[in-house]
C-alpha cells in the first residue's frame, strides 16, 4: 500500500498523463503481473498518435533501466509483445527501429544477493520477441487474427465511458451512488469479457499460433511467480538456519533449484540426466576429433612413404633412361608397389569404406601426377639429347669446313709459288715513252759515266756520282742496295778510273713516272737530235783505243748543247721530287725479287734512269 501511495505521489508531482500513469502501473517494480484489461487498454490507446508517443517514451525508459530494476525490464517486454500483437502498426515500426535495444536484452544478466540470476525470464522474452519481429509472415497472421477477435468483442458489448468524478466515499449524495453503480456495472462487464475470452480460448486448437502465444505468455507469468516464491522461501530458510541449533545445522540443507536452457524449473534428476547427456556428447565429439587426427596422421605417413617410394622409382628410371638414350628405345616404367587388399565390412556407408575410397582417389591422383612428371622428364631429356647431337653435328661440320679452307689456302699458296718459279719477272715500263725517246741520248750519256755535269765537273766530282754510286750509297727509293756484281765489265774506260756511275748490272726499279725506267736500247741517231752525226751510246768492246780522243773531243764540243737542253727541263726534276717513297716492306719485296733473279741467272738492263739523280 505504501508503494502505491509513493507511485501516486510521483505521478502527481511529475505531471504524468493518464496514459503514462497506466504504463507505469503496468510496469511497476512489484511481483504483480500486468492484467489483460490494462494491456488491452494500452493497445487501444496506441492508435492515438499522442498516446502512442507517450506509451513508447515510457517503455523506452523502462527497457533501459538498471539491473536492480529488472522487473521494469521484464514487464516492459511483456507490454511491448502485447502491443506488437494487438496494437497499432506504429508499434511494429517502432520495435524495428529500436531493434538493437531488444536484441541487447538477450544477454541481460543480474544476480541478486543470493547469487540467483534474475535475467533468465528477460532473456527468454527478448528472444521470443526478436524471432516474432524477424518472421514477417507469422506476425502478419497473428495481427490479422487478433484484429478480427477484437472487433467481435467490441460488437458484443458497448464500451464504458471513462468519466472520473472525485467524490467522498462517505458522502451519501446521489453522485456517489451513481459512481458506485457505474463501478459495479463495469466490474460485471469485465467479468463477462473475461468469461467470454476464456470460452474462446477453450475453443482454439492446440496448433493455433495465437493460442500458443497466449499460452506461452501465461506460462511465463506462472513461472515468474513460482521463481519469486522459491526465492522468498530460500531467503526465509537461510534466515532461520542461522538461529537453529547445531543439531539442526547438521541436517542436510535444501537442494538448490535447477533450470533448463529456457529458464523452466526442473528436478535434480532431470538436471543430472541433462548434464550426463552433455558430457557424453562432448566425450563423443572429442573421441571423433581424436579419430580424425589419427586418420589424418596415418594418411600423411602413407603419403610420405609413397613419395619416398616414388622418388626412388623415379631415380632408378632416370638412370635407365640415361643409359638407353643413345639406343633411342623406350624403357618400361617401374611397376608400382603392391598395395594390401582392404578387408572388413561390406557396408558402403561405413567410415572405413569412405576412408578407403578417399585413399584410393588420392593414390590414383598421385600416380597420375607421377606419370605426368615422368613424361615431362623424358621429353626434357630427349630434347637435351637432340640439342647435344645438333651442336656436335654443327661443330663437326664447322671443323670440316675450316680444314677444307685451310687445305684450299695451302693449295693456292703452293700454286702461286710454283707459278712464280715458272714465270720470270717481266720488265715493266714505268716511265713515259715519249719522254724517254726524246732524252734517250742524255740518259745514255749519264748512264755511261762520261762527260761533265751542268756545273762543269768531271770524273768523281760530278754531282750524279755522289748519289748514284752503287754499293756505297742507297737513296730513299732503295736504289744501290746489293747491285754491285762481280761480272766482268765491257767498258774499257772504267778499269783505271771512276768517273760517275760504275758499269754494273743494276736491277730496274719501278719508281714512278721518271724517264729512263724502261728497257734500254741503243739510241737511234737522227739529224735533229744529233746534228753532228756522232753516236753517244756506250762504247763497244770492238772499238779501237785510238778512237777515244776523237770521241771525247766531239763530246766536249757538244756538251754545252746537252747541258742547255738539260737545264730547260724543270718538269723532270719536279716529277722526281713528287715521286712517293717506298716503305720497308716494298724494299724487302724488291730484295727478294733481286735474289730470285740472281739465282735464275737473269741479267737486268744496265741503264740508269734520271730519277736516280
Curated annotation (Swiss-Prot):
Compositional bias of kind Polar residues: 340-350, 471-512
Maturation and modification: Phosphorylated by PRK1.
Phosphoserine sites (modified residues): 167, 434
GO BP terms, alphabetized: actin cortical patch assembly; actin filament organization; endocytosis
GO molecular function, one term: clathrin binding
Lipid bilayer topology: Peripheral membrane protein
Keyword Membrane: yes
Stretches assigned to the ENTH domain: 11-143
Subcellular location: Cytoplasm; Membrane
Residue intervals of the UIM domain: 175-194, 206-225
Biased composition (Low complexity): 323-339, 526-600
Biased composition (Basic residues): 148-167
Spans annotated as Disordered: 140-208, 323-351, 356-375, 471-613
Keywords annotated in UniProt: Cytoplasm, Endocytosis, Isopeptide bond, Lipid-binding, Membrane, Phosphoprotein, Repeat, Ubl conjugation
GO cellular component terms listed in the entry, alphabetical order: clathrin vesicle coat; endosome; mating projection tip; plasma membrane
Domain of life where this protein originates: Eukaryota
Residues modified as Phosphothreonine: 165, 430, 450, 468, 470
Gene3D superfamilies: 1.25.40.90
Biased composition (Basic and acidic residues): 179-188
The keyword Phosphoprotein is annotated on this UniProt entry: yes
Crosslinked positions (Glycyl lysine isopeptide (Lys-Gly) (interchain with G-Cter in ubiquitin)): 426
Family of the protein in this entry: Belongs to the epsin family.
Function, in words: Binds to membranes enriched in phosphatidylinositol 3,5-bisphosphate (PtdIns(3,5)P2) and phosphatidylinositol 4,5-bisphosphate (PtdIns(4,5)P2). Required for endocytosis and localization of actin.
Miscellaneous note of the record: Present with 1970 molecules/cell in log phase SD medium.
PANTHER family assigned to the protein according to its UniProt record, in alphabetical order: EPSIN-1-RELATED, EPSIN/ENT-RELATED
This protein's name: Epsin-2
Natural source organism: Saccharomyces cerevisiae (strain ATCC 204508 / S288c) (Baker's yeast)
Lineage: Eukaryota, Fungi, Dikarya, Ascomycota, Saccharomycotina
Gene this chain is encoded by: ENT2
Amino acid at each position: 500500500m505504501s508503494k502505491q501511495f509513493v507511485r501516486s505521489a510521483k505521478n502527481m508531482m511529475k505531471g504524468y498523463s493518464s496514459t503514462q500513469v497506466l504504463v507505469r502501473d503496468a510496469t511497476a517494480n512489484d511481483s504483480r503481473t500486468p492484467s489483460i484489461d490494462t494491456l488491452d487498454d494500452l493497445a487501444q490507446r496506441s492508435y492515438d498518435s499522442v498516446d502512442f508517443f507517450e506509451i513508447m517514451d515510457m517503455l523506452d525508459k523502462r527497457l533501459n533501466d538498471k539491473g536492480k530494476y529488472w522487473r521494469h525490464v521484464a514487464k516492459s517486454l511483456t507490454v511491448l509483445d502485447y502491443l506488437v500483437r494487438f496494437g497499432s502498426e506504429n508499434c511494429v515500426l517502432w520495435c524495428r527501429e529500436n531493434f538493437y535495444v531488444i536484441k541487447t536484452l538477450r544477454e541481460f544478466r543480474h544476480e541478486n544477493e543470493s547469487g540467483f540470476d534474475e535475467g533468465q525470464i528477460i532473456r527468454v522474452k527478448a528472444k521470443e520477441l526478436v524471432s516474432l519481429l524477424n518472421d514477417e509472415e507469422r506476425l502478419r497472421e497473428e495481427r490479422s487474427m487478433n484484429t478480427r477477435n477484437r472487433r467481435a468483442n467490441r460488437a458484443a458489448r458497448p464500451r464504458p465511458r471513462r468519466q472520473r468524478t472525485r467524490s467522498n466515499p462517505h458522502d451519501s449524495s446521489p453522485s456517489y451512488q451513481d459512481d458506485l453503480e457505474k463501478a459495479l456495472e463495469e466490474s460485471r462487464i469485465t467479468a463477462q469479457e473475461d468469461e467470454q475470452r476464456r470460452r474462446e480460448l477453450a475453443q482454439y486448437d492446440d496448433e493455433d499460433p495465437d493460442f500458443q502465444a497466449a499460452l506461452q505468455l501465461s506460462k511465463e507469468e506462472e513461472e515468474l511467480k513460482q521463481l519469486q516464491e522459491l526465492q522468498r522461501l530460500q531467503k526465509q530458510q537461510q534466515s532461520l538456519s542461522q538461529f537453529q541449533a547445531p543439531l539442526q545445522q547438521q541436517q542436510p540443507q535444501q537442494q538448490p533449484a535447477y533450470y533448463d536452457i529456457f529458464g523452466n524449473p526442473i528436478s535434480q534428476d532431470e538436471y543430472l540426466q541433462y548434464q550426463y547427456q552433455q558430457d557424453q556428447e562432448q566425450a563423443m565429439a572429442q573421441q571423433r576429433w581424436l579419430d580424425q587426427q589419427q586418420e589424418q596422421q596415418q594418411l600423411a605417413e602413407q603419403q610420405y612413404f609413397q613419395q619416398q617410394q616414388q622418388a626412388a622409382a623415379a631415380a632408378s628410371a632416370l638412370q635407365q633412361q640415361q643409359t638407353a638414350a643413345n639406343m633411342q628405345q623406350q624403357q618400361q616404367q617401374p611397376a608400382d608397389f603392391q598395395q594390401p587388399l582392404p578387408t572388413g565390412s561390406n557396408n558402403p556407408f561405413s567410415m572405413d569404406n569412405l576412408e578407403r575410397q578417399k585413399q584410393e582417389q588420392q593414390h590414383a591422383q598421385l600416380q597420375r601426377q607421377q606419370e605426368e612428371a615422368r613424361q615431362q622428364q623424358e621429353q626434357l631429356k630427349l630434347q637435351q639429347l637432340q640439342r647435344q647431337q645438333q651442336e656436335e653435328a654443327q661443330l663437326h661440320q664447322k671443323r670440316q669446313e675450316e680444314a677444307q679452307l685451310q687445305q684450299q689456302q695451302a693449295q693456292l699458296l703452293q700454286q702461286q709459288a710454283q707459278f712464280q718459279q715458272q714465270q720470270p719477272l717481266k720488265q715493266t715500263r714505268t716511265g713515259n715513252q715519249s719522254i724517254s725517246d726524246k732524252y734517250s741520248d742524255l740518259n745514255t750519256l749519264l748512264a755511261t759515266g762520261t762527260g761533265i755535269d751542268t756545273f762543269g765537273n768531271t770524273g768523281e766530282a760530278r754531282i750524279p756520282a755522289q748519289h748514284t754510286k752503287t754499293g756505297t750509297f742507297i737513296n730513299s727509293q732503295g736504289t744501290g742496295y746489293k747491285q754491285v756484281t762481280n761480272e766482268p765489265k765491257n767498258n774499257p774506260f772504267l778499269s783505271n778510273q771512276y768517273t760517275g756511275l760504275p758499269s754494273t748490272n743494276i736491277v730496274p726499279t719501278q719508281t714512278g713516272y721518271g724517264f729512263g725506267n724502261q728497257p734500254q736500247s741503243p739510241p737511234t741517231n737522227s739529224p735533229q737530235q744529233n746534228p753532228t752525226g756522232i753516236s753517244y751510246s756506250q762504247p763497244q768492246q770492238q772499238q779501237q783505243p785510238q778512237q777515244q780522243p776523237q770521241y771525247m773531243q766531239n763530246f766536249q764540243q757538244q756538251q754545252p748543247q746537252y747541258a742547255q737542253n738539260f737545264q730547260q727541263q724543270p718538269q723532270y726534276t719536279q716529277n722526281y721530287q713528287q715521286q712517293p717513297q717506298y716503305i720497308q716492306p716494298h724494299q724487302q719485296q724488291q730484295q727478294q725479287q733481286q735474289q730470285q733473279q740472281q739465282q735464275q741467272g737473269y741479267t737486268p738492263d744496265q741503264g740508269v734512269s734520271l730519277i736516280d739523280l
